[in-house]
Regions:
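Membrane-embedded alpha-helical signal segments
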Residues: 1-301, 305-314, 318-320, 433-470
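Short polybasic/polar patches that bind polyanions
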Residues: 158, 199, 344, 371, ...
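Transmembrane alpha-helical segments that form the functional core of multipass membrane systems
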Residues: 249, 256, 262-410
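Hydrophobic alpha-helical transmembrane segments of membrane transport and translocation systems
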Residues: 378-380, 384-470
Length: 470
């Protein structure tokens, strides 16, 4: 093959410039001599598996000549032993592959380059998610590598119908995004709809991973606090969802996997329901539904009844406040709502060695000291303590804050308009839920609207596996 003088130097210099060799300390560009020809290899230091690269280079250096090798593909077939290796002629794709952790090899006299997958990301070990623990079942969890997450899913679903479709999102970050679904179970219309939304994303980066993707493809409803997607860090939950026909959205650099489509009733499900007998699982689900309603209505209803003591029946007089207080009740309730969030934020930044002391200090400030100073009455602390604990009975952090904002709005409406405010707040909450538009799917209130009795019954109770295992 005839080689153009200076062509290799120009290609190498251009790739050095695009990859930042000499500008970024972690970008390595090494010149080799393979079969009597000049070659250059690019790799990001910290990504590469040194053992794999050393083995590959040791096999290339003794090659006496490449005169009998007609194409770069023939070279890759004969001398490249790495399993995941391909010839790439598109310069931009080759550069992107290097930034993603792969190794690029360019040889004088051949067009394009060989892209080798010899990467080894710095990863934490597989461990159970802190926010989704189970008494029984597997104790592993997704990590920050989409390849590792795909392997955890493949381990549970050994079926040729399982499809993992790779996309890249972000003009600068070029983050790997994987659509995961079962070919014979997925709704093709919803799949095409989601794929088009991802391909139409025009963003520079998705540094915040799944939240950035959700915001980019979600309908514009910034004023609506209800979550439009579910997340999980558990491979067993992801596997069960995809087998039911759901679509998983895996995003590199985050352990959270998006479960689509999403509806309000899907938040009633929790992994522990399926690791207990059907009757126990159904009971736990019913408890979760009741607690969700109590979380929304306990403090507004109590405040409404206490605000109008003349209309209170004698059997409910125990709800009235007998102690003297200086701060209005509405301010007490909103103040405790605010302080609970402050404690949550502070606990995230508190070192483990100080967490016990921090908990004791927070309990004293919110408890005995506040009551003695007559800032708060004991009844407010009791009801707000129940609300704070009950908020964790359902697993979605986003749904918890949606309920919290609706509860605070109810309190303000009751303060302004009494019973009419309570009725208006309930109607407004229902209207807000009904107007929520999910990323994809039949509707946020499905299977209630549009009604599907079979699916609704399946969501409200734990159905045992039948003899057909379906």
């Amino acid at each position: 093959m005839k080689r153009v003088k200076g062509a290799f130097d120009e290609r190498a210099a251009a790739l050095d410039g695009l990859l930042g060799v000499g500008r970024s300390f972690d970008m390595i560009g090494r010149t080799l001599r393979i079969g009597g020809r000049r070659a250059r290899l690019w790799v990001v230091n910290g990504y590469a598996d040194d053992t794999v690269l050393e083995r590959a280079i040791s096999a290339w250096l003794p090659i006496p000549s490449l005169e009998d090798v007609g194409t770069l593909q023939a070279f890759a077939d004969r001398y490249v032993s790495v399993c995941d290796a391909a010839v790439e002629t598109d310069r931009l794709k080759a550069v992107t592959a290097v930034f993603a952790g792969k190794t690029l090899l360019v040889i004088d006299g051949f067009s394009g380059g060989v892209v080798l997958d010899a990467k080894q990301f710095p990863l934490r070990s597989v461990e159970e998610p802190d926010t989704s623990k189970v008494l029984r079942g597997s104790h592993d969890g997704f990590g920050e590598s989409v390849m590792k997450n795909a392997a955890l899913l493949r381990r549970r679903i050994r079926d040729s119908q399982l499809t993992l479709e790779s996309l890249q999102v972000g003009t600068r970050s070029r983050t790997d995004v994987v659509l995961c679904y079962m070919e014979n179970r997925v709704d093709r219309k919803l799949l095409d709809q989601l794929r088009k939304k991802l391909e139409a994303m025009d963003v520079g980066s998705i540094a915040m991973s799944q939240e950035s993707v959700a915001e980019a493809i979600a309908p514009p409803q910034w004023w609506n606090p209800f979550p439009k997607t579910r997340y999980t860090e558990r491979p067993d939950v992801a596997a069960a969802s995809v087998l039911e026909g759901d679509i998983l959205l895996m995003i590199d650099n985050t352990p959270a996997v998006m479960l689509l489509p999403c509806s309000l009733f899907r938040f009633l499900e929790e992994v522990n329901d399926y690791y207990f007998p059907p009757l126990v699982g159904t009971y736990l689900r019913i408890v979760r539904v009741i607690v969700l309603f109590l979380t929304l209505f306990v403090t507004p209803l109590w405040y409404l009844l206490v605000k109008s003591p003349d209309t209170l029946h004698e059997s409910l007089h125990f709800l009235l406040i007998e102690d003297e207080y200086y701060v209005p009740l509405i301010l007490q309730l909103l103040l405790v709502e605010f302080i609970i969030d402050v404690l949550k934020l502070a606990s995230l930044n508190t070192p483990d060695v100080l967490s016990n002391s921090f908990s004791m200090l927070g309990a004293l400030i919110l408890g005995d000291f506040a009551v003695q100073a007559r800032w708060l009455v004991p009844e407010v602390l009791v009801y707000m303590a129940f609300v704070a604990i009950a908020n964790y009975a359902q697993h979605s952090y986003e749904m918890g804050y949606a309920v919290k904002l609706c509860r605070m709005a109810l309190l303000l409406l009751i303060w302004l308009f009494d019973w009419w405010g309570f009725i208006g707040g309930i109607l407004g909450t229902l209207a807000l839920i009904a107007s929520t538009r999910p990323l994809i799917g039949k509707g946020y209130l499905y299977p209630f609207i549009p009604f599907n009795g079979k699916d609704l019954w399946a969501l409200l109770h734990h159905r045992p596996i039948d003899r057909n295992n379906s």
